[in-house]
Amino acid sequence: MSLKDKIESDYNNSIKEKDSNSINTLRLIKSAIKDKEISLRGKQDALTDSDILSLLQSLVKQRKDSIEAFEKANRNDLIENELNEIKVIELFLPKQMDEDETKLIIKNIIQENNYTSIKEMGALMKIIKENYTGKIDMGLVGKIALSLIHI
């Protein structure tokens, strides 16, 4: 079952269970997928699961950015809504590696390729993106990689 099919199935189950939070969030996900499909017409046949994963990650990132803004504005009601949406979206994402696992992976790649300069950061990020898309927080990778390459 593809990720898109799983989202559709969960959407239908949420409607049956009358879970309004899940329904609204899954509608949002389906809409984002449809928008992406429309923007790729003629360029690509259909969205792959990895395309959908990156889309879901961007949706989570948007929500986290919104939470920061809502915290500054002291809007706890909106923060709770965003957190609930993140929980639903994350059901479709693979488990993210923690900071220690991420650091170990980056150290290994740096040692294997003898990266010593910040100029090689792009190559490092490319390797990580190719091998760990969806499993690793790229924002965290950037911070850790900068600290390790400078050492």
Predicted segments with their positions:
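Strongly charged, low-complexity linkers/loops
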Residues: E80-T133
